[in-house]
Amino acid sequence: MKSIKREKLSILTNFCDKNGEIPDFGTTLLGKEFTNSLSEEEGLFLNYGQRNSAFPYSQQNQYGRELKQKEFLSVTLENEYLKAVFLPELGGRLYSLFDKAEKRELLYKNSAIRFCNLALRNAWFAGGIEWNCGIPGHSPFTCSPVYAAVDEDENIFRIYEYERIRGITYQVDFSLPSGSRFLHCRSRIVNPTNNVTPVYWWSNVAVRTGGNNLRVVAPTNRAYTHHNYNVITVPVPEYDGIDITYPENSPVAVDYFWKTRPDAPLYMAAVDGEGKGLVQLSSSRLKGRKLFSWGNGKGSDHWQEWLTHDGDDGKYCEIQAGLAPTQYESLPMPPNTAWEWVELYGAINLVPEKIHGKYTDAQSAVEEFLKTALPKDYAENFLRQTAALAKKPLTDLICKGSSWGALENLRRKTIGNRPISQHLQFTETDDGVDDWKNLLLNGSFGEHNPLVAPKSYTTQTEWINSAEKAIRGKDKNNWYAHYQLGCAYLADGQIKKAAERLLTADKLVVSPYVKCVLAQAYLSQGKKNKAASKAIESAERAPDNVEVCQFAAKILFQTEYYQKLYDFTHCLPEKMQKNPRIRLYSAFAAVEIGRAEEGEKLLNLNGGLCIPDMQESEITLGELWFKIRERKAETTGEKYTRKYSDIPYKFSFQMTNER
């Protein structure tokens, strides 16, 4: 028995399909690099392929906290033992994997799709299995539609996309064969370019914790982690006085990348106190395995509640599988190459004593289970047997992704090159590639209204070369061409060249968007006064645009011009002043210029300041709370000592040791 079904699924969500208007290049364009204390035998590609932003992808930051019911397209694969539910409009996320025999959910299934700021594009949501390809961090498509197609005869559900930062295509073919107790996930990445490119893949699996004595088992006795960005190896299972294979033992948020044994099958299992849980097995290419624990602090608890519907979905951890040994790196992928692998996900049910005793006994128990559940070398054999099927075109397209794959094929056609991944159907959708098509076919971007936000960007070398040619010809006096080049240079770290193009654009037209990016260029050069001036100018040109005004306030906050920030926010319309981010910056400014009581009032107004897109690792609310107490203590001559444990729960987002 097997079936594939598509239907609408109603889920609570704060989903917003409107993207941000201002491109993001990271805070300072200077990301933190990893050092290491590893032996020369480790051979990690540390820092290779790391990025500071998701540019040219737009930010997905226009959501609030209010949840409403919304219907999402879902695809369900089902057989006698398992039921798998996917969401193609949200990166192809595996939303649920249900064990029919035990009548239990194998994943952490979030009752709400609640966007929060944990990804390079901002929006991310917890739960299920996420398929992360391209750049380090969460997939650029994790909260976006991807291409999805079905083949009911073969019982295959396929997701795929063109990832334009790396210039690669990826696809995952999902199947649930009749009689199988494992969901089959067959992945394929193709580098169709003539260049070596950094490639990143991690399958991110959320599993429930919260008092269930969950233990994570993998074929390892060492793990990679980092202390203050210095990568080290630590023993498994005992490290620093705790058994790190139990996620709930960790006092703080932490990543452990299991150093898998070369002689063992590549698996990971998350098994609770009753001996029940989820097991994953892969073919040989997918060597990396990871455990992420949120830790046990107040801030960690708050984050898990923040990601759910009022915290009523409980706690979770993540077990992950990747191409590289760690997420501190990408792997160099040769030109014109395909990488393929298979993952299998299913239920595991063992005697609890075998799992919750010696770690070597737990490993043996899982490995014996896999030997019994699957034929020898099953994953490798399945990979070979489905090689032709993976290149079969699927014509029943049920969800469309971006237009960039179709645009790349058009670009290739004009120079006589073959299309990318010819068995994958890429179409044109309404996501703003017309500018680039015009550049390709006519040698010009054409005219653009400087008061309307540009819809799309790129950093691909071929397009940048075309834009550079355009400003020497038809687009010499076209602000938009200079602006696009300025953005591309800034993303590439060519800050001087970026500033030159952006200054040219700023002289040609009055555009708040040019001024916003120019402010970021100045900030990255350390020219704080110029950055602040351009930020204020951007808001003056778009006084009714909340995003532009919020951006201006952010730049003034980053440059620490607190009096200017205070004056700026207090000149905004009352409705604009209520924006959570603007209110936060205004409160900081008030405290820094000696108005601590005013800052405290802004912080506590209406039950306390709530920032919908509070960023992972951001502690601005706690910092503001501390500063208010320090300023008050100064006025009375008292000494104030910071203690993270004192921060009220609603303002607590730190994931470090509380002291």
Over which residues does each language-model region extend?
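A contiguous, surface-exposed recognition patch within enzymatic or periplasmic domains that forms
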Residues: 2-44, 75, 89, 96, ...
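Extended, loop-rich substrate-binding clefts of extracytoplasmic carbohydrate-active enzymes
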Residues: 35-78, 126-182, 211, 299-328
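Short Pro-Gly-centered flexible turn/kink motifs
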Residues: 75-78, 86, 148-150, 187, ...
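Acidic, contiguous internal or C-terminal segments within carbohydrate-active enzymes
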Residues: 78, 84-102, 159-210, 218-222, ...
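Short coil turns that delineate tetratricopeptide repeat
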Residues: 475-476, 509-510, 543, 577, ...
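Alpha-solenoid helical repeat scaffolds
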Residues: 480-484, 513-517, 547-551, 580-586, ...
